């Protein structure tokens, strides 16, 4: 007869806790166990809607949050040092949530840095995209110029496309062929748009009647969860990237049906103006978009809020994004930075598996728990 002792039970419990997830997977979250997508390289930093620029052998990460936090690292996998914030106080945009801008996008243009950011509320079109600029990418020298575009209310909000869209999730792109700068933006409602910017990036070119490109739309579906646009170029194609699905608020709004959470999608075109089509030649204005990266391995959930860093020093392009680690949690503050190098197959971007397994997120495994069960049996029979 086996005599189960209290010390034996306590030791078994300690062994179990040492390998069990810190925050067990919520029973309502359906995290795909597909291996069709590679695991991410871990960024080792909490970040929702990250924007990353490379400058002087360092990476600078900007994320949504109070006054737009700024981090610096010499490697995309960290360690990241928090430097401060872009803004010194509330945004000059006169709308709610002035202290906590969303989804910043930072770029360098003609020896000056620009930070485009969103001011909005969940589920509202009364939004604005603001812009700040600085001679330095680091905190301390940024000047807030206030709103660039308004939707819902405010100057210019009655002009197309601002009268049908939602001014959040800004992205900047300079056409490498013509040099023309563009702003891409949009979320839900009528989808994602592109407008040309003036040379100083502080206003829309021909603001009362901008030369508008409609890039992404879901014409027959409600809701219309396309947002988080990013434009990149690799000759001969322009790539319109976006996030599709429910991004967040899983604790308050619940988990969507599997496959309806965030995923990263793309279309391509030989013109910056489009039309953009996916692998099946479906127009992004008709609900198209090839899935480049989605939930995977029972561990990675709802990747999105993406950007693409052009390759440097012979390295490939980098796809970076935020995602939720199912072993950690699904709150807004649990979103983490992930990244993968990109290969291009027949002109389509494909994320590359991490080359350093020690830096990648590891899928859940039952092996550790099986070992614990065996050790517990040994302990119970010997104590």
Curated annotation (Swiss-Prot):
Keyword Signal appears in the UniProt entry: yes
Molecular function in Gene Ontology: arabinan endo-1,5-alpha-L-arabinosidase activity
Similarity field: Belongs to the glycosyl hydrolase 43 family.
Pathway: Glycan metabolism; L-arabinan degradation
E.C. designation(s): 3.2.1.99
GO biological process: arabinan catabolic process; xylan catabolic process
Lipidation (GPI-anchor amidated asparagine): 356
Chief localisation class: membrane
Annotated site location: Important for catalytic activity, responsible for pKa modulation of the active site Glu and correct orientation of both the proton donor and substrate: 169
Residue stretches in coiled coil: none
Keywords assigned: Carbohydrate metabolism, Cell membrane, Glycoprotein, Glycosidase, GPI-anchor, Hydrolase, Lipoprotein, Membrane, Polysaccharide degradation, Signal, Xylan degradation
Membrane topology term: Lipid-anchor; GPI-anchor
Signal peptide: 1-22
Compartments (UniProt record): Cell membrane
Positions glycosylated per UniProt: 75, 163, 206, 325
Matches recorded under InterPro entries: GH43_arabinanases (IPR050727), Glyco_hydro_43 (IPR006710), Glyco_hydro_43_endo_a_Ara-ase (IPR016840), Glyco_hydro_beta-prop_sf (IPR023296)
Active site: 49, 227
Name assigned to this protein: Probable arabinan endo-1,5-alpha-L-arabinosidase D
Substrates-to-products reaction catalysed: Endohydrolysis of (1->5)-alpha-arabinofuranosidic linkages in (1->5)-arabinans
Function: Endo-1,5-alpha-L-arabinanase involved in degradation of pectin. Its preferred substrate is linear 1,5-alpha-L-arabinan.
């Amino acid at each position: 007869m086996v005599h189960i002792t209290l010390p034996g039970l306590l030791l078994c419990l300690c062994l179990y806790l040492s390998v069990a997830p810190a925050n067990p997977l919520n029973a309502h979250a359906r995290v795909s166990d597909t291996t069709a997508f590679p695991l991410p390289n871990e960024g080792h930093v909490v970040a929702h809607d990250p924007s990353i620029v490379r400058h002087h052998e360092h990476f600078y990460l900007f994320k949504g949050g109070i006054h737009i936090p700024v981090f610096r690292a010499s490697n995309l996998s960290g360690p990241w040092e928090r430097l401060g914030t872009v803004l010194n106080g509330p945004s000059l945009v006169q709308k709610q949530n002035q202290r906590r801008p969303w989804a910043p996008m930072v770029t360098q243009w003609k020896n000056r840095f620009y930070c485009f950011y969103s001011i909005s509320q969940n589920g509202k079109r009364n939004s604005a995209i603001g812009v700040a600029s600085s001679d330095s990418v680091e905190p301390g020298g940024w000047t807030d110029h206030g709103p660039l575009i308004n939707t819902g209310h405010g100057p210019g909000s009655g002009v197309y496309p601002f009268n049908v869209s939602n001014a959040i999730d800004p992205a900047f792109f300079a056409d490498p062929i013509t040099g023309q700068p563009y702003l891409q933006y949009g979320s839900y409602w009528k989808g994602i748009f592109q407008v040309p910017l003036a040379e100083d990036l502080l206003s829309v070119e021909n603001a009362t009647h901008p030369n508008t490109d409609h890039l992404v739309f879901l014409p027959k579906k409600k809701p219309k969860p396309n947002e988080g646009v990013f434009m990149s170029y690799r000759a001969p194609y322009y790539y319109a990237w976006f996030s599709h699905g429910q991004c967040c608020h899983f604790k308050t709004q619940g988990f969507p049906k599997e496959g309806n959470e965030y995923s990263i999608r793309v279309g391509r075109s030989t013109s910056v103006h489009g039309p953009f089509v996916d692998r099946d030649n479906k127009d992004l204005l008709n609900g198209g978009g090839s899935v480049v990266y989605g939930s995977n391995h029972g561990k990675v959930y709802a990747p999105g809020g993406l950007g693409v860093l052009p390759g440097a020093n012979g390295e490939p392009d980098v796809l970076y994004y935020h995602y939720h680690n199912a072993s950690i949690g699904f709150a807004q503050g649990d979103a983490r930075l992930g990244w993968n190098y990109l290969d291009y197959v027949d002109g389509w971007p494909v994320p590359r598996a991490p080359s350093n397994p020690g830096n990648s997120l590891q899928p859940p495994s039952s092996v550790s728990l099986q070992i614990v069960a065996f050790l517990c049996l040994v302990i119970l029979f010997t104590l």
